[in-house]
Amino acid sequence: MVPLMAVYWLVYDRESQSTAAQAQITAGWGGAQVLTGPVLVLPYVANVTRTETINGQDRTSVVRERRELFVAPSTQRIETTIAPDRKGYAIYESVVYDSAMSGTARFDWPAELARLDVDPASVLADQAQLRFGVSDPRGLKDGARVEVGGTALALQPGNGPAATGGAGFSAFLDWTARQPLAVAWRYGVRG
């Protein structure tokens, strides 16, 4: 007869070793991935009224505050290829993948800025930004490229959308023309 605690300990030990083995296998691949974007971010300046109490007196002031308006693409097409593979470590096995993503998106100038309480004159269109989210950037592969109107943009790490905890990559662009924006992109992820 085997004591119940010995069985419990054996199961716990194997689970711990399995978790450690999976971490070892996927160390160079990146973990589970959440991918988002592209999202176009338009910064703007808003006048915000603030009231604070100083020595029992209410004081109201108007402060200029920088905010961000997130614009989703009006149309988007995405193509993804995924090549799964099994990697092993001792008696443990884990599935990893290598993926390639490409797509196009079209952004139109937001027509309802007034409804969103955004003054069109306060939009800093010359500081617009495209953001792509990759939750575990260790898995990003070389060769990422983002083009607007056929011109490649300089990519920067980080500053992804909130859905990926700010992880990912981004690119600044000038949208002062306020004409439809054609974006093409491609990048690869391992996970």
Each predicted region: which residue ranges?
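Elongated amphipathic alpha-helical scaffolds of membrane-associated proteins involved in membrane
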Residues: 4, 29-36
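Soluble non-transmembrane domains of integral membrane proteins
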Residues: 16, 20, 27-28, 37, ...
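Short, structured protein-protein interaction patches enriched in aromatics and acidic/basic residues
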Residues: 44, 48-49
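Hydrophobic alpha-helical transmembrane signal-anchor segments
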Residues: 1-13
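Short, well-ordered alpha-helical packing segments
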Residues: 7-8, 22-26
